[in-house]
Amino acid sequence: MQTIYTKITDIKGNLITVEAEGARLGELAEIERVDGRSSYASVLRFDAKKVTLQVFGGTSGLSTGDRVVFLGRSMEVTYGESLIGRRLNGVGKPIDGEGECFGDPIEISTPTFNPVCRVVPRDMVRTNIPMIDVFNCLVKSQKIPIFSSSGEKHNALLMRIAAQTDADIVIIGGMGLTFVDYSFFVEESKRLGFADKSVMFIHKAVDAPVECVLIPDMALACAEKFAVDQNKNVLVLLTDMTAFADALKEIAITMDQIPANRGYPGSLYSDLALRYEKAVDIAQGGSITLISVTTMPGDDITHPVPDNTGFITEGQFDLKNNCIDPFGSLSRLKQLVIGKVTREDHGDLANALIRLYADSRKANERMSMGFKLSNWDKKLLAFAELFETRLMSLEVNIPLEEALDIGWKILAQSFHSEEVGIKEQLINKYWPKSCLHR
C-alpha cells in the first residue's frame, strides 16, 4: 500500500521538500497536482523526516497542497525491440510522434558490469575516418572522449561515426541540445541511413537539469540490455558531457552543497566515472563502446570537466581546426589491435607518417621565420600538404586498408624509400611498384 504525503513544506527552483519517512536515495515519486496533472520527481536527499526531491519538468504550477506518492523504485526506461529507431526525452517518453514504446521497464541506476565477466578487448571498431582508424584505433569496449574546441563541428563528426561504424546498434544521448542541434541529429540520421539501427535520448537546453543527468543513465542502461540479452555490439555516443556536468553543478547549488573547483560538486569525478565505466566487452556476449563529446570552455583543457575526464578514459580525440589533431590525440588501447587484427604494416606506417608530419611542422616554422629551406624541408612541406588533404581532412571517408595504401602513396610521392625509416621487408612488400626506383 502506497502512502500519500500532502505536506510540501518548501518549493525552491526545481526542488521540493516533503515531510515524509521511509524514502530512499534515487527513489521515484509521482506528484499529483490539484489541477489533475501529474509529474515525476526523484529523491535527492533526506534528513530526519524531510525528503528533498528534484521535479522533472520543473516546479511551475506546483502548490503546497499537491499530493506526493513514493513509488518504491528508481527511474525506469522502456527496453525492447520497439525502441530501435525511436527518439525519447529525458524521462524516457517518446518525442517523435510515433506513439508509445512497448517493452519491459528496466532500472537505469544499475552498478557497473561484473569485472569477472569482462574480457580484454581485442577487436577494432571501424569508423572509416583515417585519423581514427589509422593513428588512434577505436577498440571495442573502449571509453574515449572527443575534446572539442570552440566552434568545432563535433556533432557532425559524431553523426559520421554513427553512420560509418560497424556496430550493431547506435545509441545517442544528447544533453543541452539547442533546437538546431536536435534537428540536425534527426535529419542526419535519416540522410545517412542509420536511423533504423539507432536510439536517441534527447535533453534540450530548455528542459529541466535533472533530465539532463538522466540521459547517460538511460542510454547506457539500454545499451547494457542489448549487449547482455541480445549479444549486440553497441556504440554509445554522448554529447555534451560538459552540459551534463553543468546540470550536476546547477543541482548541487540548488541543494546548497559546498562547491569544489569552479563551482562543480566534489563528486564530479565519481559522477563521470560511474557513466564511463559502463563500457565493457562481455565474455560470451556483446559489448558497449562509449564515445563522448566534451567541449572545453575557452579551449581550456585544465577545465574541471575535461581534466577529470582524462583520468577516467582510455585516451582522447582532440578536435581542433576542423580536424582530429594527431599530436593531441591518443588511444591507449590501439596496441591491442594494430598489427594483430589489422595489416602488418599498420604500426610502422602510422609511426612514420606521424614522425614526418611532426618534422614538417618544424619546417613550416622555419619557413615562417624566414630561414632558408633545405631540400629536405621542401620535401617535408610537400608531404604535409598531401597528408593533410588526403588523410587528415574530416571529409575523407575510406576503409582502413585503403587509407594505409594512400599513406604509402603519399610517402612514395614525397620521399625516397630509404628516407622514411620503415623496415626493408615492409618497403619491398608495400612501397608502390611505380616508385620503387625512388
Swiss-Prot record:
InterPro entries referenced in this protein's UniProt entry, alphabetically: ATP-synt_VA_C, ATPase_F1/V1/A1_a/bsu_N, ATPase_F1/V1/A1_a/bsu_nucl-bd, P-loop_NTPase, V-ATPase_su_B/beta
Pfam families tied to this protein: ATP-synt_ab (PF00006), ATP-synt_ab_N (PF02874), ATP-synt_VA_C (PF22919)
Taxonomic lineage: Bacteria, Pseudomonadati, Chlamydiota, Chlamydiia, Chlamydiales
Purpose: Produces ATP from ADP in the presence of a proton gradient across the membrane. The V-type beta chain is a regulatory subunit.
Keywords in alphabetical order: ATP synthesis, Hydrogen ion transport, Ion transport, Transport
GO annotation (BP), single: proton motive force-driven plasma membrane ATP synthesis
Protein name: V-type ATP synthase beta chain
Gene3D superfamilies: 3.40.50.12240
Family annotation (HAMAP family): ATP_synth_B_arch
Molecular function via GO: ATP binding; proton-transporting ATP synthase activity, rotational mechanism
Organism per entry: Chlamydia abortus (strain DSM 27085 / S26/3) (Chlamydophila abortus)
Family: Belongs to the ATPase alpha/beta chains family.
